[in-house]
């Protein structure tokens, strides 16, 4: 999705009270902040198989039910255990392996790694975004070598239509069979159903797919990303206990939780605390709503963004009136690596003691994107989130997406600072 066109559409449709459907964790979202979807959910704030210049990667490789790769490892045969008992699942962008070579992954910060994305088709088949099945084989092998579980993530941003068609009528049996085949023929340990946006009417199919996979492959791990919630709008979470009954992890996409919408002030991509009517999203407020809806804490995870959000002038900090400011860059367009190499300075860094996250502030537009305020996560905010996970008894964290956190020009041992922080603060 083209970043600026999506941003313009977000602003227009949000003003009209409609679901923009431009954003989410997955294929097709380049740089906008997460779009509000129906029911008050944020449709995720991350993910995309495009960069700010357009589509990357080669032709898609079709995944059906007849691959002849090696047998799958049972999910239970990989411990994945950590000192804290928490999980850490990072999403690896299949369309951009050059940005983060598998050989450079900091495995000590992960218990699970998800190959993103396999795209569902109306006939129940799937295509791997980027079209490189060997990449999946290599990632699975490397993960297992390091004691990390490998997950096939299905869907991504704007995948709702594909899921609905693949799970309709007689197609759902074929779709589920192909998912089982993906497990048994590649070595994946589980399936991640990244259905975005997921409306109330989609919930029965989400449950049906998991049940079919569990019946055929009882040892498979089942995970699902879920939306952050706008407290002004609320959300109908009555179906989530049934979803939690058939999924092992429900991970909140708690990044990209800001925008330049009517009625909003400038805000953070991933605020831990502090919500009001003009900044209506935080991790804590969302977690409380899911827990109140009887989602078990031990199955609930929170998200950490490996990218930031960039606002234009006159905004220079969080919780300011927009006064014409726009959100000019987000996922893919302003990765953590780009923030650290093109924007960061100790004098620009500030700390929001209420939201418990950092930000960069500039008095005038800062190249290359003209940012005057950048929200992002760093080692200190990850430590805060790790402490929160432990205090609340939550299951763990996810990261969108791993490729954006890699500092290729840093010295060896210093190229994955965010994963190192997760190792220290979440897993131990």
Each model region followed by its residue ranges:
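Glycan-binding loop/region signatures in secreted carbohydrate-active enzymes
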Residues: 109-110, 261, 299, 304-390, ...
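Conserved, mostly hydrophobic/aromatic
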Residues: 113, 152, 193, 250, ...
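Substrate-binding surface in catalytic domains of secreted glycosidases
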Residues: 122-134, 195-339
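Ser/Thr-rich, Pro/Gly/Ala-heavy low-complexity intrinsically disordered linkers and tails
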Residues: 18-83
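Mobile, glycine-rich extracellular loop/lid and propeptide segments
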Residues: 155, 190-196
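Alpha-helical scaffolding within the catalytic cores
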Residues: 95-103, 132-139, 174-179, 231-240, ...
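Bacterial N-terminal signal peptides
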Residues: 8-20
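Glycan-recognition patch characteristic of GH18 chitinases/ENGases
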Residues: 83-183, 316, 323-324, 348, ...
């Amino acid at each position: 999705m083209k970043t600026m066109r999506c941003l313009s559409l977000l602003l227009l449709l949000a003003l009209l009270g409609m679901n923009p459907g431009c954003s989410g964790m997955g294929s097709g979202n380049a740089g906008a902040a997460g779009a509000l979807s129906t029911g008050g959910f944020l449709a995720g704030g991350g993910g995309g198989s495009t960069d700010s210049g357009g589509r990357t990667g080669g032709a898609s490789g079709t995944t059906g039910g007849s691959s002849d790769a090696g047998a799958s490892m049972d999910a239970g045969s990989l411990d994945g255990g950590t000192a804290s008992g928490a999980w850490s699942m990072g999403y690896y962008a299949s369309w951009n392996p050059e940005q983060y070579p598998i050989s450079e992954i900091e495995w000590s910060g992960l218990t699970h790694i998800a190959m993103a994305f396999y795209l569902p088709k109306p006939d129940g088949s799937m295509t791997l975004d980027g079209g490189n099945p060997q990449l999946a084989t290599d990632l699975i092998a490397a993960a297992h070598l390091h004691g990390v579980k490998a997950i096939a993530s299905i869907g991504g941003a704007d995948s709702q239509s594909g899921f609905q068609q693949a799970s309709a009528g007689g197609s759902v049996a074929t779709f589920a069979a192909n998912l089982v085949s993906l497990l048994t023929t590649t070595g994946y340990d589980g399936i991640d159903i990244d259905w975005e946006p997921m409306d109330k009417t989609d919930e029965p199919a989400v449950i049906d797919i998991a049940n079919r996979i569990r019946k055929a492959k009882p040892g498979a791990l089942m995970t699902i990303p879920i939306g952050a919630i706008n407290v002004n709008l609320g959300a109908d979470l009555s179906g989530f206990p049934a979803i939690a009954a058939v999924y092992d992890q429900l991970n909140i996409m708690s990044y990209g939780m800001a925008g330049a919408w009517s009625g909003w002030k400038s805000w953070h991509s991933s605020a831990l605390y502090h919500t009001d009517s003009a900044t209506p999203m935080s991790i804590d407020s969302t977690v409380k709503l899911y827990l109140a809806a009887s989602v078990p804490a031990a199955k609930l995870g929170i998200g950490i963004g490996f990218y930031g959000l960039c606002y234009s002038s006159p905004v220079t900090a969080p919780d300011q009136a927009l006064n014409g400011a726009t959100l000019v860059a987000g996922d893919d367009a302003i990765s953590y690596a780009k923030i650290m190499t093109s924007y960061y300075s100790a004098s620009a860094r500030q700390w929001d003691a209420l939201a418990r996250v950092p930000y960069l502030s500039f008095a005038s537009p800062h190249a290359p994107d003209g940012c005057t305020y950048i929200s992002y996560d760093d080692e200190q905010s990850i430590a805060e989130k790790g402490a929160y996970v432990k205090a609340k008894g939550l299951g763990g964290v996810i990261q969108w997406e791993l490729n954006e956190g890699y500092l290729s020009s840093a010295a060896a041992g210093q190229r994955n600072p965010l994963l190192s922080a997760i190792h220290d603060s979440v897993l131990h």
